[in-house]
Design a protein with these regions (language model features):
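Domain-level detector of nuclease and nuclease-like folds
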Residues: 1-117
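Ser/Thr-rich, Pro/Gly/Ala-heavy low-complexity intrinsically disordered linkers and tails
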Residues: 119-128
Length: 128
């Protein structure tokens, strides 16, 4: 029920999963008007279950949170991951905040914020 990835990509995978946790909060997709799941990172492997293809589950548990935070800390965002985030933004208009602000993972998931939140999260009109 567990998986392991290459050490050089552990942080990348962790940030992708953490992004899915904050991005997918349930509700309806803005374009397709189809339901989206509420994806939640947890530390309890008993909650994590496989959902068959084509079956909608309103809540999806994934993790393990403590392992993902370890991977995130051990493998910080590099130039390739930042470039990918920029390219995704140029096409989709969304960014992974854990690549732009790695410190937010510990702040959000471990409640250990090392600095006050910034007055502006993203520049260049992204928040508009």
């Amino acid at each position: 029920n567990l998986f392991e990835v290459w050490s050089a990509l552990k942080g990348d995978v962790a940030r992708a999963v953490l992004y899915m946790d904050v991005r997918y909060e349930g509700g309806m997709h803005g374009i397709t008007n189809r339901p989206e799941p509420d994806l939640i990172v947890v530390d309890d492997p008993e909650l994590i279950q496989t959902t068959p293809a084509g079956v909608f589950a309103p809540v999806g548990y994934m993790g393990l949170k403590s392992v993902l935070l370890q991977w995130h800390a051990a493998d910080p965002p590099d130039a390739n991951e930042q470039l990918r985030n920029d390219v995704v933004f140029s096409y989709q208009g969304n960014r992974n905040p854990f690549i732009d602000h790695p410190e937010w993972a510990e702040c959000l998931y471990a409640c250990t914020c090392s600095s006050p939140p910034p007055a502006e999260i993203f520049g260049n009109g992204f928040e508009d």
